[in-house]
């Protein structure tokens, strides 16, 4: 289905160039920028994601992220005592979701942000998920 394709493209974008041998912050920063750039290059994905969030099938598809790069990152970070002991879904809301929210504000509300501001958001959202 189309919803699954949208979701899979999104997950693939997060994982692009990901290197689990990098320090945890650098891994996080890479995923954050991957999301930001993907949504800037594919702005219709934001509209699609907003439409699909209420569909049961999309919710089930999101649950399939359990073996994703993000989930593994969370498990590894928790095992290393770096990340808070919260579900990966909650950690995502506190961190990488900021890229989606800002991209959405940019597209739908015309609110532009500089790279300096985005780097600050990355650092602050990283602190939000640290132990």
Residue ranges with predicted function:
Residues 5-11, 30, 34-41, 55-80, ...:
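Amphipathic alpha-helical packing segments from all-alpha helical-bundle domains
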Residues 19-23, 40, 54, 82, ...:
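Residues in soluble alpha-helical coiled-coils and helical-bundle/repeat scaffolds
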Residues 73, 124-131:
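C-terminal alpha-helix
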Residues 47-51, 78-124:
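Hydrophobic/aromatic-rich alpha-helical bundle segments in the mid-to-C-terminal region
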Residues 1-30, 47:
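Amphipathic alpha-helical linker/stalk segments
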Residues 16, 20-22, 78-85, 131:
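Surface-exposed helix-capping loop/turn segments at secondary-structure junctions
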Residues 22-40, 44, 89, 93, ...:
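Amphipathic alpha-helical segments that line or abut small-molecule/effector binding pockets
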Residues 13, 17, 38, 128:
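Short alpha-helical functional segments enriched in proximate histidine and acidic residues
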